[in-house]
Amino acid sequence: MGLGRYEFLADYGDGFIAYLNGQEIIRVNLGAKDTPVAHDRSTDRSHESHIYRQYEAPVDGFYIDSAIVRSLIHPGENVFAIEVHNDSVANDLSFACTVYNLKNNGWYNIYNSVFRYYRQVPLDSSKFPIVVIETDEMGIPQIHTRVRARMKVIDKPGLKRPTDLPVYEGYISIERKGESSAWFPKMSYNLETQNADGSNQNVSLMGMPAENDWVLFCSFADKSLIKNELVFMLGRKMGHYEPRTQFCELIYNGEYMGLYYFAEKIKRDKNRVNVGKRDTVFPENGGYVFKYDKPTRKLVQFIYPDKDEVTTAEKNYLTGYIKSFEATLKSSKFLDPIEGYRRYINPYSPIDYIIINELTKNCNAYLYSTYFHKDSRGVINYGPLWDYDLAFGGASWQEGTLTYKWQFEFNTDLNIKLMLRDTVLKNRLAERWWKLRSNFLSNDSLMHYIDSLYQATTDSRILNYKVWPVEDKYLFGPDHYVASADEEVAFIKDWLRKRLAWIDANIDKIYYSARC
């Protein structure tokens, strides 16, 4: 068998060093690479093995590239040695490992522990803020399980280094974010900044207004790493609140995890979704933030009031309001100036939402991660925008890869097609489209935004793909294959030009009979 790339799977407690023919190739929780380690040294931090955790989860897979293997392997006998250390003098030392040859496996399988791995790469410096998170020995376990941790944010002017003094250091509560994506090797996280007693601590981070709920988003399925930021920027240019974001680097329990972006979590706040406070006595007087999302589909998920705190009266009021809106859309009175559908929604609000989701042909549009808000005694508004890493031709399902057809005709849950029977709304949609096309949605402007975002992340993106050697691998979603992030951006731009041309040719042709 020829020499190839290898993966070293390790289930350990609490740290180890791996050597190939006497040369160190992997080190975990035992100080800096190639520094001497006494035989009785304890580890830098605790790490409980998965065997002792007693739950099913992939163990850590470390990538060993072919250049290292070729430089260290020689003809004849070779020695692969492991030095294992505990966090203290105790009888719970544990270690198990396996080595796989990856030479003939091009597909990086996010759901198969054999083919999901990362490379240990040190972070020397970055122009982006550095987020450092330290958990206890259990790490961040299964989905929807919050744990206490510590977080530092390094964000001085100029280049930032992991050794710099932090501008913020404190406690957080953190959990894996997402459903299927929560099992990706590179994970996104929801986190809450806290005081020592566990109460919320509102802090201003990376230039964003003070709050306590945040998201660390990695966009693992998006090889360009810029789709979400591009869409949020377009939403802001349209004049709407979209979550503020900042690219950042993540160091998790001593390991550099690559490029992320730090984002505001969608919630009610004067600097986020600015709706009125709840009214538990007269629920129609309260503000609401809610969404449609899997697995509930047509059921409302409450964001504000919190789903665990919402009263029966509030739930009945909002669900009743939405059901009345949907029933009116399907009735003969849907265009009635007094009793029609416009009494329930801001008639301008769907327009920009439709434009963004048709421009990107987001496969999840009108179906998943779809947010709404309603102010006190007000009507429903669409937004904020969220979750576009599979947009721009990035998904092979729900017609997400097509540059033609309307996405609202495929994903029908939000009844966009029914609303567009209203010729006033349809004409406003076309007028808005052409106005934006002559401005920041022009071909030249969009290509410029893509190039600017992509170039701004160059150094961090290159380092990210050293950590996660998947740039040339087929990942999650697309029916196209690209061998690099550069090729992915070229694909996005070509796909977008075709999509824009199709919308230009069809936006004025939208017509649905009042009886459809």
Give the residues covered by each predicted segment.
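Aromatic-lined ligand-binding clefts that engage carbohydrates, nucleic acids, or primary amines
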Residues: 1-20, 80
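Surface-exposed patches in mature extracellular/periplasmic domains of secreted proteins
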Residues: 3-7, 240-250, 336-340, 441-445
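Short strand-turn-strand beta-turns centered on an Asx-Gly dipeptide
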Residues: 19-23, 253-254
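An acidic-aromatic loop/edge-strand motif
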Residues: 31, 41-119
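Middle-to-C-terminal accessory/interaction subdomains
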Residues: 113-114, 120-123, 127-130, 138-141, ...
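Conserved oxyanion/phosphate-binding beta-strand-loop segments in alpha/beta enzyme cores
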Residues: 159-220, 317
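Internal "kinase-insert"/substrate-recognition segments embedded within catalytic cores
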Residues: 192-198, 209-219, 238-243, 255-355, ...
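A conserved alpha-helical element in kinase catalytic cores
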Residues: 220-240
